[in-house]
C-alpha cells in the first residue's frame, strides 16, 4: 500500500499489478477509510488513465457473481451520472423502448446521487422489482429482452464505500467504473460520461475490456446524447476509435432547450416515462429519448444510420407497445 500511495503522491500512473492489488484490497475491505479517501483524491488529481480504469473494472468483475449466461451479445446504456442537471432519466426510458423493439438490454445501474431519479429509483417507482434474484432476472430477460442489474447486489465495495465517496464532494474513479462492471459483460454499449474529456479515455477502457461496439458520449454537459447542444462522441468500431460531434440535424430532429428536460422531483420522472412509452409525452422529452434509442439501434446493426434509427423508433412508439412491454417487465420481475 505504501508503494501505491507514494506513486500517486508523485502523480505516476499505477501499473496493472498495482491496480489489481489495490482493488482486491478494496473489495476485501483491507483499505482504511483514510487511505481510500487519499487514493481516490490522488487518482482524481493525477487523472485516471484508461489502463487504470480498465484493470480496476476487470478486477471488480472477477469478484462479481454472474447471474446467468444468455449466450447473446448484450447491450447496456448505463452512464456515469454525475452531471447534476436533474433531467428526466433518458437512458432508462431508452432501454425500455429498445428492449420492446427486440434489443437485448442488460441495464446496470443504481440509485441517484446527483439527479431526482437514477435508473433504480425510476424502475422501482414504476413498480419493477429492482432486486430480482438470478432466476427471476433470467426469466424476465428471456421473455422481455430486458434485465435490470442493481449494482449494490453485485459490487459490495461500491455500496460500502458510498458514504466515504459522498463526503469527498467530487467524482472519483468509481463514477467511471459503474458503467464498466455490468456482471453480464455486455458487448455493445452506449455510455454517457459527465465530462467531455472522459470520452476518449472511456472508449479506450471499453476496448481494453473486450467490448465489440460502443459509443461514449457527452452532450452539452450531460451524460446523454442531446438535441439542445452538440454531443461529442467517441465510437468504437472495428477495434478503432472514431471521434466526432453530433447535432440534432444528424438525427433529423429539431433542437430543444435543456430546461425542457429538467424536472422537479422523482414523480415527474415517472410520469414522463409513462407518457413517452404511451406515445403521449412532451415532444422535447420524447425526441431526446428517440435519439438515444436510435443510437442503440445503430450500434446493434438494426439501423444503417441514426436517421433510420429515429424513423424506426417513432413508428414503434405509435403502436404504444413500449407501455405494454413495461407492464410485462413489472409482472415478471415479481414472478
Curated annotation (Swiss-Prot):
Record-linked Pfam families: Glycos_trans_3N, Glycos_transf_3
Gene Ontology molecular function: any one: anthranilate phosphoribosyltransferase activity
Gene3D superfamilies per the UniProt record, alphabetical: Nucleoside phosphorylase/phosphoribosyltransferase catalytic domain, Transferase, Pyrimidine Nucleoside Phosphorylase, Chain C
UniProt: anthranilate 2 binding residues: 165
Cofactor binding note of this UniProt entry: Binds 2 magnesium ions per monomer.
Matches recorded under InterPro entries: Anthranilate_Pribosyl_Tfrase, Glycosyl_Trfase_fam3, Glycosyl_Trfase_fam3_N_dom, Glycosyl_Trfase_fam3_N_dom_sf, Nuc_phospho_transferase
UniProt EC number: 2.4.2.18
SUPFAM superfamilies: Nucleoside phosphorylase/phosphoribosyltransferase catalytic domain (SSF52418), Nucleoside phosphorylase/phosphoribosyltransferase N-terminal domain (SSF47648)
Cofactor(s) the protein needs: Mg(2+)
Pathway field: Amino-acid biosynthesis; L-tryptophan biosynthesis; L-tryptophan from chorismate: step 2/5
Catalytic activity field: N-(5-phospho-beta-D-ribosyl)anthranilate + diphosphate = 5-phospho-alpha-D-ribose 1-diphosphate + anthranilate
Recorded family membership: Belongs to the anthranilate phosphoribosyltransferase family.
Subunit field text: Homodimer.
Protein name: Anthranilate phosphoribosyltransferase
Organism: Helicobacter pylori (strain HPAG1)
Amino acid at each position: 500500500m505504501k508503494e501505491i500511495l507514494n506513486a500517486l503522491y508523485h502523480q505516476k500512473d499505477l501499473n496493472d499489478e498495482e491496480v489489481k492489488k489495490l482493488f482486491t484490497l478494496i473489495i476485501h475491505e483491507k483499505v482504511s477509510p483514510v487511505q481510500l479517501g487519499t487514493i481516490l483524491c490522488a487518482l482524481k488529481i493525477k487523472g485516471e488513465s484508461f489502463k487504470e480504469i480498465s484493470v480496476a473494472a476487470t478486477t471488480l468483475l472477477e469478484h462479481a457473481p454472474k447471474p446467468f449466461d444468455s449466450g447473446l451479445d448484450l447491450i447496456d446504456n448505463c452512464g456515469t451520472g454525475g452531471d447534476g442537471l436533474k433531467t428526466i432519466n433518458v437512458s432508462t426510458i431508452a432501454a425500455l423502448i429498445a428492449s420492446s423493439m427486440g434489443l437485448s438490454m442488460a441495464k446496470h445501474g443504481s440509485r441517484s446521487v446527483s439527479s431526482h431519479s437514477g435508473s433504480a429509483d425510476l424502475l422501482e417507482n414504476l413498480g419493477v422489482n429492482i432486486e430480482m434474484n438470478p432466476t427471476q432476472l433470467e426469466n424476465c430477460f428471456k421473455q422481455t429482452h430486458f434485465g435490470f442489474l442493481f449494482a449494490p447486489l453485485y459490487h459490495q465495495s461500491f455500496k460500502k464505500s458510498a458514504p466515504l465517496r459522498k463526503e469527498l464532494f467530487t467524482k472519483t474513479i468509481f463514477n467511471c467504473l459503474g458503467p464498466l462492471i455490468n456482471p453480464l459483460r455486455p458487448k455493445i454499449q452506449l455510455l454517457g460520461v459527465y465530462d467531455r474529456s472522459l470520452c476518449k479515455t472511456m472508449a479506450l477502457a471499453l476496448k481494453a475490456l473486450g467490448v465489440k461496439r460502443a459509443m461514449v458520449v457527452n452532450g452539452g454537459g450531460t451524460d446523454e446524447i442531446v438535441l439542445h447542444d452538440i454531443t461529442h462522441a467517441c465510437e468504437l468500431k472495428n477495434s478503432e476509435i472514431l471521434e466526432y460531434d453530433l447535432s440534432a440535424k444528424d438525427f433529423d430532429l429539431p433542437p430543444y432547450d435543456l430546461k425542457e428536460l429538467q424536472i422537479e422531483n422523482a414523480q415527474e420522472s415517472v410520469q414522463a416515462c409513462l407518457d413517452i412509452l404511451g406515445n403521449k409525452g412532451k415532444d422535447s422529452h420524447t425526441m431526446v429519448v428517440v435519439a438515444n434509442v436510435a443510437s442503440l439501434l445503430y450500434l446493434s446493426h438494426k439501423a444503417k444510420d441514426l436517421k433510420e434509427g429515429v424513423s424506426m423508433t417513432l413508428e414503434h412508439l405509435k403502436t404504444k407497445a413500449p407501455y405494454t412491454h413495461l407492464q410485462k417487465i413489472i409482472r415478471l420481475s415479481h414472478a
